């Protein structure tokens, strides 16, 4: 799970495997495969980094 922040400051966790589309114009909007949309403070690049970190941690756990 990755931790994101809504524009109102509320933090929430999202399963990155559910992310279908991320747009940035100018607000960053995440749309999931379930049809939910979230407007977040993080940039598209920050979200990409969070997803990469999450996937690396999952792979490390499998190797242990």
Spans of model-derived segments:
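Eukaryotic intrinsically disordered, low-complexity regulatory linkers and tails enriched in Ser/Thr/Pro
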Residues: 1-13, 17-64
């Amino acid at each position: 799970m990755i931790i994101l922040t809504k524009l109102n400051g509320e933090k929430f966790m999202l399963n990155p495997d559910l992310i279908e589309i991320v747009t940035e114009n100018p607000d960053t909007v995440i749309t999931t495969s379930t049809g939910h949309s979230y407007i977040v403070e993080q940039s598209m690049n920050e979200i990409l980094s969070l997803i990469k970190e999450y996937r690396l941690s999952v792979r490390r756990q499998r190797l242990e």
